[in-house]
């Protein structure tokens, strides 16, 4: 899949933390929280993305998977490595991880109808977590799936599988706490771009297969967390 120049995406950023936060606030105003029309039908392809680090953080490793939306069959896997461009700064994860994620996206042979990213969407201090930033610059419908809360308040969901409660930030709902597996902490689900709050929840639920993580980010997480792994060869496309 081709995308615009990664350098051009960051051209407006001068590298400072203050400017990055200002850009986040500006970009957050462009986020669309309505479903892309093709989500109302039956998307055929899903993608999942996650990031890990090697060499004591000097190398960013991004994993991408492409899946059949109907049966969650794995079609492609890719891992790319790029030099880490900035240190970890709370709330600015997307500026650190996005270059590698965009490189991983270019490896996909087809455009996914819906993307899951390991991280937050609008459940973020400035409503622009990694999933929202990724969705905005790629113009792809995107959902953030995070393992821990970053902002907001919620009532702990019930212990049964599928129980969920809204996450509120300053009185506005920004996501869901979802009990994706019994005896596990809830996931933090939030829309990134071109996905409604309702669809962010229902699509995540559709992709659960007995594990805590939905299948797209579970598979990407497995790839991104393998230390010292060489670039993963593609699985043959079965569509």
Curated annotation (Swiss-Prot):
Keyword DNA damage (UniProt): yes
Xref: Gene3D superfamilies: archaeoglobus fulgidus dsm 4304 superfamily
Cellular localization per UniProt: Cytoplasm
Listed EC numbers: 3.1.21.7
Cofactor(s) in the UniProt record: Mg(2+)
Binding site for Mg(2+): 50, 118
Enzyme class name: hydrolase
InterPro entries registered for this protein in UniProt: Endonuclease-V (IPR007581)
Catalytic reactions on record: Endonucleolytic cleavage at apurinic or apyrimidinic sites to products with a 5'-phosphate
Any GO BP annotation: DNA repair
Site feature (Interaction with target DNA) residues: 88
HAMAP family: Endonuclease_5 (MF_00801)
Function statement: DNA repair enzyme involved in the repair of deaminated bases. Selectively cleaves double-stranded DNA at the second phosphodiester bond 3' to a deoxyinosine leaving behind the intact lesion on the nicked DNA.
Family per record: Belongs to the endonuclease V family.
Protein name (record): Endonuclease V
């Amino acid at each position: 899949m081709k995308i615009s120049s990664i350098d051009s995406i960051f051209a407006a950023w001068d590298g400072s933390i203050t400017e990055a936060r200002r850009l986040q606030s500006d970009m957050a105003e462009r986020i669309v929280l309505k479903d892309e029309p093709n989500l109302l039908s039956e998307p055929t392809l899903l993608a999942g993305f996650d990031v890990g680090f090697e060499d004591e953080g000097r190398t960013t490793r991004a994993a991408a998977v492409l899946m059949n939306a109907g049966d969650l069959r794995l079609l492609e896997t890719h891992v790319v490595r790029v030099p880490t461009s900035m240190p970890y700064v709370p709330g600015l994860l997307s500026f650190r991880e996005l270059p590698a994620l965009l490189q991983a996206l270019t490896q996909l042979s087809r455009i996914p109808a819906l993307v899951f990213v390991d991280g937050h969407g609008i459940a973020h201090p400035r409503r622009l977590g990694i999933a929202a930033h990724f969705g905005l610059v790629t113009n792809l419908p995107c959902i953030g799936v995070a393992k821990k809360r970053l902002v907001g308040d919620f009532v702990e969901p019930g212990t049964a599988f599928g129980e969920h409660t809204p996450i509120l930030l300053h009185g506005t709902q920004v996501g869901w706490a979802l009990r994706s597996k019994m005896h596990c902490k809830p996931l933090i689900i939030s829309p990134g771009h071109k996905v409604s709050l309702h669809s962010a929840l229902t699509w995540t639920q559709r992709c659960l297969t007995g594990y805590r993580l939905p299948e797209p980010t579970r598979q990407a997480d497995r790839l991104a967390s393998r230390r010292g792994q060489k670039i993963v060869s593609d699985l043959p496309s079965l569509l």
